[in-house]
Amino acid sequence: MNQAENRIDQILKRGVAEVIVEEDFKKLLLSGKKLRLKEGFDPSSPDIHLGHMVALRKLRQLQDLGHQVVLIVGDWTAQIGDPSGASVTRPMLSAEQVKANAKTYLEQFFKIVDKDKTEVRWQSEWYANFKLEDVVRLSSKFTVAQMLARDDFAKRYAAGKPISVTELLYPMLQAYDSVMVKSDVEFGGTDQKFNLLVGRELQEMLGQKPQQVLMVPILVGTDGVHKMSKSLGNYIGVAEEPTEIFGKCMSIPDELILQYFELVTDIPATEIADFKNQMANGLVNPMVLKKRLARELITQLYSAAAAEEADAQFTRVVQRGEIPEDMPECRLENGESICVIDFIIKADLAKSKSEARRLLEQGGVEINSAKISDPGTTVKCGDIIKAGKRRYSKAV
């Protein structure tokens, strides 16, 4: 096996769940043809997390071999909501919400993928002028029985839960994207398999070569149970501050450390195998490996210097209990005092009042290093508030 074949083999094996059709994809990669690598995203939320990063890293690896990424911004399908893995119909988003989410999503996307080797396309380029006859013609290519073969649809149908007609259209619309951009390969998670294969079918029906499909594993979130998801709060966002990424890495269950190393870092497989052996024999403290993981991630997303500073701050603030030298400030209106619950929300130390109250009840809130539990406590200018293990804000 020559160097090029070895590199391609590594890309198609590590961090990959399934390739359809693997031999055909290998031949394409070795042919010298510049491939169009399709990745679509629905900007239904404004943030990318490590779960998305698994596929994005594959795209970057293939860009480095000279291939072109075609990024589809699903400004139409986002208003429907991808039903993949959903147990209920998702709420529709407004066009304004979708555009706002897409802006921040693209900024984060290019932290991982090479912008100069990426073609960005918006679904509205072809769907803005789609007529009813076009919808009928497209939907006539498939049957309701085919759509209900999806695992998530089948479960909802069997349970008597509603499935909207727009959701049935979703896989066809995603497939039509592949036709419009002449996709050679489409990327996605294993929960997207049905949609990706519909793309192959539709391309063939319309006289194009069917795209290859590369599926990546689903990354388990920091709770160790569910798929990483912002809605579940078990995510590590790629745009979060380095100190926040570092702290969240420390919270992942020990049994997930190796999976994270494999899927979202470039640590050699031989070194990961050594980590596995050391953990199995009690030769390494898992925290040491989590710190290594955090530094690797922050170096990818920011810089080596940012990684070292985040490591040092974690040691000072979390392990030694020191107050950080630099912390966010939250300005009080006219210098007046404010209820601690309201301050926690205003300073973005918690996302909701219920979360803030829960922190108080669990003893997770301090004012000037003194634990408090009374939600009626007030915060005044100069106070330093700590929420959870590592979040601080100064009232000014």
Curated annotation (Swiss-Prot):
Amino-acid positions noted as binding ATP in the UniProt annotation, renumbered to this chain: K230
SMART domains: S4
Keyword Oxidoreductase: no
Keyword Disulfide bond included in the entry's annotation: no
Sequence ranges assigned to domain S4 RNA-binding in this UniProt record: 338-396
NCBIfam families hit by this protein: tyrS (TIGR00234)
Family label: Belongs to the class-I aminoacyl-tRNA synthetase family. TyrS type 2 subfamily.
Protein name: Tyrosine--tRNA ligase
Source organism of this protein record: Dehalococcoides mccartyi (strain ATCC BAA-2266 / KCTC 15142 / 195)
Organismal lineage: Bacteria, Bacillati, Chloroflexota, Dehalococcoidia, Dehalococcoidales
